[in-house]
Amino acid sequence: MSTITSAIPDQKKVGMVSLGCPKALVDSERILTRLRADGYAMSADYAGADVVLVNTCGFLDSAKEESLAAIGEAIAENGRVIVTGCMGEEADAIRAAHPQVLAVTGAHQYEAVVGAVHEHAPPSQGPYVDLIPQPSEADIKLTPRHYSYLKISEGCNHSCAFCIIPQLRGKLASRRIDAVLREAEKLVAAGTKELLVISQDTSAYGVDTRHEAKSWKGREVRAHMTDLARELGQLDTGDGTPPWVRLHYVYPYPHVDAVIPLMAEGLLTPYLDIPFQHASPKVLKAMKRPANEAKVLERLKGWRAICPEIAVRSSFVVGFPGETEDDFRYLLEWLEEARLDRVGAFRFEPVEGAAANALPDPVPEEVKEERYARIMELTARISAEKLQRKIGRALPVIIDEVGEPDEDGDIGATGRSQADAPEIDGAVYLRNVPATLAAGDIVQVTVEDADEHDLFGAIARV
């Protein structure tokens, strides 16, 4: 639940439960920013809220179950609940499970959800529109101050067989490049040290607008991933250094190659999140994904030649309909050669409305589980081998949390290297840090040990 309080008498308070991906989190921030402009405060718990918003996820059946459970908990604890987000597109299913909900709105229907809050918990004060920026430039953050998600577009033009994002979020709709850069500049000025660029398809940014250029700092800048990355890398965090800039959800188009030199130059964090999903040409074709796994291996080698520090994260689906043991072994062999830095895997789940549901030869659940265990075992071993090579090196680390002194007075801290995005990747655990260290500080750390996913070390002596 968000915590933003106010001393204004009788001010109505809103609670927020945000589920799902970082893109949904950005939507939650935007909704809360608008509500604060309209005179609301935010409640840190159910008891203090006049109404509770539940921003749902509807991508997988398991996510829908989690969303319905969260709605039920909010109803039990508070009783006045408004539902929004991706599962909001299934209003009948929500009302069948929880008829007490006050209102249901769909994904990124900002005006509708704000209107529902006004209807069921009218603000006791007038709007404070002069106190904060426009809603498109999120003022309320649900992440720590030192990192922020920067959403550059909504929707997707692909028709992957396992996905219903286009039905939930629509076709690609890119934000104006100048609006994105203004938001990024504002976030950095407010203390953000790390920008995480997100969308449904970051590589396609600007395709729908034919990469329309806008004026920025006296020059024309195109709405294109490469141009955006270059501009973000020129922002100043206040000490003469740029923020860390990570690219997430990058579809492997050929023009992705152009951002690798920016990483080598230090303008962009050497990190790419590319959801390859599989390696077997047969499975990729069934998924309606690009099937050129050999070319991907060549590109990985080329990227590493240009920027040896690059970390590549990806996600894969196991147990897709028609996936044979040979297909799965092909994937494992491909992963052995690709040696990706960070890997997430998911067991295939049928999603209502997805084309994959009609495919023949479903994989039994016990086979999915066995394959999931095998892919996680392999990728954990590869990760451990790669992290072992970092022992003895000094790496830049951004601090996420500083602990309390132990009985000996030693203070520990947790941070992340440039190879680690928040919440989904590994961590760096530091020992005996100075009491002056704070979240958001970027320090050089000497790596002393490593396991399958995390590093351990101490601040390097200058």
UniProtKB/Swiss-Prot annotation:
Catalytic activity: L-aspartate(89)-[ribosomal protein uS12]-hydrogen + (sulfur carrier)-SH + AH2 + 2 S-adenosyl-L-methionine = 3-methylsulfanyl-L-aspartate(89)-[ribosomal protein uS12]-hydrogen + (sulfur carrier)-H + 5'-deoxyadenosine + L-methionine + A + S-adenosyl-L-homocysteine + 2 H(+)
SMART domains: Elp3
Annotated positions binding [4Fe-4S] cluster 2: C156, C160, C163
Domain Radical SAM core: 142-385
GO biological process, one term: tRNA modification
UniProt KW keywords: 4Fe-4S, Cytoplasm, Iron, Iron-sulfur, Metal-binding, S-adenosyl-L-methionine, Transferase
Cofactor annotation comment: Binds 2 [4Fe-4S] clusters. One cluster is coordinated with 3 cysteines and an exchangeable S-adenosyl-L-methionine.
CDD domains: Radical_SAM (cd01335)
InterPro entries, alphabetized: Elp3/MiaA/NifB-like_rSAM, Methylthiotransferase, Methylthiotransferase_CS, Methylthiotransferase_N, Methylthiotransferase_N_sf, NA-bd_OB-fold, Ribosomal_uS12_MeSTrfase_RimO, rSAM
Requisite cofactors: [4Fe-4S] cluster
Described purpose of this protein according to its UniProt entry: Catalyzes the methylthiolation of an aspartic acid residue of ribosomal protein uS12.
Record's protein name: Ribosomal protein uS12 methylthiotransferase RimO
Species classification: Bacteria, Pseudomonadati, Pseudomonadota, Alphaproteobacteria, Sphingomonadales
Gene it is expressed from: rimO
